[in-house]
């Protein structure tokens, strides 16, 4: 028996009210939200998403601004390379697609910075096409409820096939099931504290039926701590540049982090990524 019907019924009464789930939300808004949600919690994304769409309501609006404006507006969302990719995608949409976000997966995949998950998510949630969409939350639900292990392990090619086997044939039902299973993994079947007492498919869950066995497979890679990392140093340098209307000198950048080797490595990485450019011996966001 598929878990989709029960999860979809639960979702109808328990899904969170999020901007990208509301009627009339644009395909561009969906694309922006997916970029932001890639590695940032929902609670931090919602206010920034609303700011972005008010400032840049269409791809053409963002394309007309500089990449530096996009990086500056990205601010504390983290992984600012996404801002450059989103700006590049906006330029491509404007130039290749007349300012309209494409709706088929191959065309979406051809845009800068868009991988398989984002392409499928936009095709499904913005345009209503039938595709399996697999993120970490969906992988966790399938691993536990259908396959039995307590964790999904590293991403694998079989993930899409596992989700495809669950999806209803009806296009509307499939779209709802994608969103519902994703939501279940986000708020109920969580990684550390699953709330099995309120789970709508607890009676169908293979992991629960087996007595919650410990996971013995290969685990997904765990992200290193942020404090003291190169990521933190990169963020501090970018924050310094965002706060300045003029290029920032190497001496000023030296004040943000005391360890010379790590600071220089972080700055070199930002330059290589195109997030920072050199200007007459100083540094600034890309123009």
Model segments located where?
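Residues in the recognition helix of alpha-helical DNA-binding motifs
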Residues: 122, 266-269, 284-286
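Core RNA-modification/binding signature centered on pseudouridine synthases
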Residues: 242, 280, 285-287
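Short amphipathic alpha-helical interaction segments
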Residues: 257-272
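A short, conserved structural fragment
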Residues: 271-283
């Amino acid at each position: 028996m598929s878990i989709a019907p029960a999860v979809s019924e639960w979702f109808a009464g328990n899904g969170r009210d999020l901007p990208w789930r509301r009627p009339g939300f644009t395909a561009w808004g969906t694309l922006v939200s997916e970029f932001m949600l890639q590695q940032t919690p929902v609670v931090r994304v919602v206010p920034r998403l609303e700011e972005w769409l008010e400032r840049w309501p269409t791809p053409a609006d963002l394309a007309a601004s500089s990449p530096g404006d996009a990086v500056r507006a990205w601010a504390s969302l983290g992984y600012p390379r996404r801002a450059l990719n989103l700006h590049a995608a906006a330029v491509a949409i404007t130039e290749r697609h007349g300012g309209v976000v494409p709706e088929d997966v191959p065309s979406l995949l051809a845009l800068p910075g868009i991988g398989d998950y984002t392409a499928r998510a936009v095709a499904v949630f913005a345009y209503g096409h039938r595709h399996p969409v697999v993120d970490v939350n969906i992988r966790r639900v399938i691993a536990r409820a259908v396959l039995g292990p307590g964790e999904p392990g590293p991403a694998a090619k079989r993930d899409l096939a596992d989700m495809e086997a669950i999806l209803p044939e009806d296009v509307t039902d499939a779209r709802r099931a994608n969103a519902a299973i994703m939501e279940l993994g986000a708020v109920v079947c969580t990684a550390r504290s699953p709330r099995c007492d309120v789970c709508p498919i607890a009676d169908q869950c293979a992991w629960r039926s087996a007595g919650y066995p410990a996971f013995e497979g290969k685990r997904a890679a765990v992200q290193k701590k942020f404090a003291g990392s190169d990521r933190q140093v990169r963020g501090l340098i970018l924050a310094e540049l965002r706060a300045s209307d003029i290029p920032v000198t190497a001496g000023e950048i030296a004040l943000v982090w005391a360890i010379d080797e790590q600071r220089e490595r972080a700055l070199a990485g930002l330059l290589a990524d195109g997030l920072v450019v050199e200007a007459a011996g100083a540094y600034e966001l890309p123009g």
